[in-house]
């Protein structure tokens, strides 16, 4: 799924958003970029305040135990839904003990593109988009906002496999 050239890419690059004239992350990113001075004002409070449903987490933990699960996330640091859902997602995976090495995070501009075109083949229309893969085959997406909650929607995707 993830081409080898990504390992050589610079992480957490920023550029100026033309509409807001503010810095936004672009391209391949990770949690460190989201927790940097530019973006921690929304990441930390949302991460800390999100209340996880522990019953669903227990079921999720069982669902991912023996899987080859990987997740690609496409988000915009300029996007309110991304600012809300991405910290919640990280709290969920931290609670699950899910390895960040199985997560690829791309930040896009308002056209839903990166400068290097990494997301061009993913058919992104709204952000954030969480794409779940089992053994490199797409098994489901959460687009923009969850239907119920992130952890419930994740469980629903994994339960259909």
Where are these regions (language model features)?
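Conserved helix-turn-beta segment immediately C-terminal to the redox Cys motif
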Residues: 64-70, 88-106
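Conserved redox-active cysteine motifs that mediate thiol-disulfide chemistry
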Residues: 77-85
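Structural recognition of the beta-strand scaffold that forms the well-ordered cores
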Residues: 71-73, 104-105, 132, 141
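N-terminal leader/targeting and pre-domain segments
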Residues: 10-66
């Amino acid at each position: 799924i993830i081409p080898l050239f990504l390992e050589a890419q610079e992480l957490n690059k920023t550029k100026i958003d033309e509409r807001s004239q503010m810095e936004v992350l672009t391209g391949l990113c990770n949690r460190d970029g989201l927790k940097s001075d530019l973006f921690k004002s929304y990441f930390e409070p949302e991460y800390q305040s999100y209340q996880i449903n522990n019953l669903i987490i227990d079921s999720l933990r069982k669902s991912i135990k023996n899987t080859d699960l990987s997740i690609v996330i496409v988000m915009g640091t300029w996007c309110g839904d991304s600012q809300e859902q991405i910290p919640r997602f990280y709290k969920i995976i931290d609670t699950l003990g899910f390895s960040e090495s199985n997560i690829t995070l791309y930040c896009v501009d308002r056209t839903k593109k990166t400068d290097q075109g990494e997301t061009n083949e993913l058919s992104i229309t709204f952000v954030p988009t969480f794409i779940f893969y089992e053994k490199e085959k797409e098994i489901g997406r959460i687009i923009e906002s969850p239907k119920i909650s992130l952890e419930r929607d994740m469980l629903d995707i994994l339960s259909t496999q």
